[in-house]
């Protein structure tokens, strides 16, 4: 949805689904039945809503499980970076799986990242996993710019009367940011009709903060 917000604003946006074992971007964008075409020796991304997308889900059968070890995962990430005709982009979002493993290290190796945006939900199990991800990205041997953290499914808002129900607990994301010294970018609520349109204000606010931080980082490089 952050990619959608930037594309709607006129930016040239790419979205790489780096979750090799559990790719979800094609399902979220309703492109799971499409297949990439070739342009010479390069694959052409699947374009949807102004976003150039690539995912392992485009390349394998829907029910096929990829039981791959680290070297195969790293090779797949390398090919997504070098064998896809991304073209000239303003932003490339990389959707990573949870955890701290080979895929994350491969992305850092193959793509010069401008920064990292973390997403968590409020409950302690998710916050604990996100805490480990922060530790990885702040490791001196990896050292990535931390843009900040988004808390998804922060509260349930059944209607427009403003009343909020904190189903999964309250404040986990903010507390984690305070501990780690990173910025809290905002909350995404659960709504009965959770569409891009009725959450667009949330995404615009968060995207604005991300773009501002990226601009500051670029100016300081």
What residue ranges belong to the model's regions?
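Gly/Ala-rich phosphate-binding loop of Rossmann-like dinucleotide-binding domains
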Residues: 3, 7, 108
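Phosphate-binding loop that captures ATP/GTP phosphates
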Residues: 6-63, 74, 81
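Generic secondary-structure signature for well-ordered alpha-helical cores
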Residues: 8, 78, 82-86, 139-142, ...
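Flexible glycine-/small-residue-rich
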Residues: 17, 47, 55-58, 96, ...
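Amphipathic alpha-helical transducer elements in NTP-driven molecular machines
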Residues: 22, 70, 74-78, 124-131, ...
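Switch II (G3) loop of P-loop NTPases
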Residues: 36-38, 56-72, 78-106
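Conserved catalytic-core segment of NTP-binding enzymes
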Residues: 90-91, 97-187, 193-196
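NTP-binding/hydrolysis catalytic cores, primarily Walker-type P-loop NTPases
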Residues: 179-182, 189-221
């Amino acid at each position: 949805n952050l990619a959608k917000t930037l594309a709607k604003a006129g930016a040239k946006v790419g979205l790489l689904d780096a979750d090799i074992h559990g790719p979800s971007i094609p399902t979220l964008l309703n492109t799971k039945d499409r297949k990439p075409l070739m342009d010479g020796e390069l694959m052409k991304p699947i374009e949807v809503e102004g976003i150039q997308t690539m995912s392992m889900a485009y390349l394998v059968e829907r029910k096929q499980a990829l039981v791959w070890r680290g070297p195969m995962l790293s090779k797949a990430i390398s090919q997504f970076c070098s064998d896809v005709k991304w073209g000239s982009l303003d932003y490339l979002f990389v959707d990573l799986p949870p955890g701290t493993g080979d895929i994350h290290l491969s992305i850092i190796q193959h793509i010069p990242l401008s920064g990292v945006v973390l997403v968590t939900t409020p409950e302690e199990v998710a916050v604990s996993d996100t805490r480990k991800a922060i530790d990885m990205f702040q490791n001196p041997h990896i050292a990535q710019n931390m843009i900040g953290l988004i808390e998804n499914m922060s509260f349930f808002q059944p209607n427009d009367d403003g009343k909020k129900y904190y189903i999964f607990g309250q404040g986990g994301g903010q507390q984690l940011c305070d501990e780690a010294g990173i910025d809290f970018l905002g909350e995404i609520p659960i709504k009965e009709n959770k569409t891009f349109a009725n959450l667009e204000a949330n995404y615009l606010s968060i995207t604005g903060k991300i773009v501002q931080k990226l601009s500051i980082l670029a100016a300081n490089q």
